[in-house]
Amino acid sequence: MNILIIGPSWVGDMMMSHSLYQQLKIQYPNCNIDVMAPNWCKPLLARMPEVRKAIEMPLGHGAFELGTRYRLGKSLREQYDMAIVLPNSLKSAFIPFFAKIVHRRGWKGESRYILLNDLRANKKDYPMMVQRYVALAFEKDVIPKADDIPVLKPYLTVEPAQQAETLKKFEKQTALLGERPIIGFCPGAEFGPAKRWPHYHYAKLAEMLITQGYAVALFGSAKDEPVGEEIRQALPEELREFCVNLAGKTNLNEAVDLIANCTAVVTNDSGLMHIAAAVNRPLIALYGPTSPQYTPPLSDKATIIRLIEGELIKVRKGDKEGGYHQSLIDITPEMALEKLNELLAK
């Protein structure tokens, strides 16, 4: 059986989708799984053994372009027995429909009654995103209840030779860290500061960790480079050599190798949080307005710190200076350090 997955467009969602691919291999041991996703996803999909190949989705997030979707679908005809559509959007279901794939499975989403012929309508019965993904591995009449959904934790393979090449490439940037064990920080998050632990808290935590004998490496995209530099500059000058800002200096593949080399990771609710979980790093996940009930790090080595209760608070702008959210400001560096030390002592 050949299965086409229409994959998600965000790092965290892509990582959680790996639980689905693992379950599909259990349900259909001889199946081939191809994933259509943005080009940047390819390094992640290449590290998932269950995926045969990644197919580039050339359209950006939000682009409709029905003609392009028709041509893509037509090019995939007579290649697949089943399609599973993970995004909820109407447009994401067009390609399998145009490909004339017989079985087209997904959640109802934006009223996709014609485009999907194996439609699941009870999404609210599955409170976690990963449960919703894995549920699509099952036939409609045997789908387990949420509490019985088997969630196989996402993982990314890390090849020692490739990782060694990556570490060598960044030798110059990390030389001053010496032999100190490295704690990775992932201080960025989509949609701005409202989901971020304040940079001054990260700086204070870095100062305490460096004083304890650790080094700190900052990870993120080019958009996160400024906040990484804010963290470094907030450190006492004599400690800055033990903190390296790699945000914007790595591609995603290199970030995976470097994060896998860290002793532990401290992170906001972000895509890199899910990557740190997938390479089995002990991690402290800092949550504020977003809810770990929906998209937690899927790892036995994760400790979540969240001081407020309830589900997702839809906020794109923080309520305090710098755009930070009060619920994240209230998480002190001392709290994070205490939980991190407990985690490392296990």
UniProtKB/Swiss-Prot annotation:
Q: Does the keyword Transferase apply?
A: yes
Q: Which CDD domains does the protein's record reference?
A: GT9_LPS_heptosyltransferase
Q: Does the keyword Transmembrane helix apply?
A: no
Q: What does this protein do?
A: Glycosyltransferase involved in the biosynthesis of the core oligosaccharide region of lipooligosaccharide (LOS). Catalyzes the addition of a heptose unit to the heptosyl-Kdo2-lipid A module.
Q: Which Pfam families is this protein grouped with?
A: Glyco_transf_9
Catalysis performed (reactions): an L-alpha-D-Hep-(1->5)-[alpha-Kdo-(2->4)]-alpha-Kdo-(2->6)-lipid A + ADP-L-glycero-beta-D-manno-heptose = an L-alpha-D-Hep-(1->3)-L-alpha-D-Hep-(1->5)-[alpha-Kdo-(2->4)]-alpha-Kdo-(2->6)-lipid A + ADP + H(+)
Q: Which InterPro entries match?
A: Glyco_trans_9, LPS_LOS_Heptosyltrfase, RfaF
Which GO terms of the cellular component aspect does the record hold? cytosol
Gene Ontology MF: a single term: ADP-heptose-lipopolysaccharide heptosyltransferase activity
Q: Where are the transmembrane segments?
A: none
Q: In which pathway does it act?
A: Bacterial outer membrane biogenesis; LOS core biosynthesis
Tell me where on the tree of life, at the top rank, the source sits. Bacteria
What does the sequence similarity comment in the record state about its family?
A: Belongs to the glycosyltransferase 9 family.
What's its EC?
2.4.99.24
Q: What class of enzyme is it?
A: transferase
For this UniProt record, the keywords arranged alphabetically read as follows: Glycosyltransferase, Transferase
SUPFAM superfamilies tied to this protein? UDP-Glycosyltransferase/glycogen phosphorylase
- The molecule here is called Lipooligosaccharide heptosyltransferase 2
One BP term from GO: lipopolysaccharide core region biosynthetic process
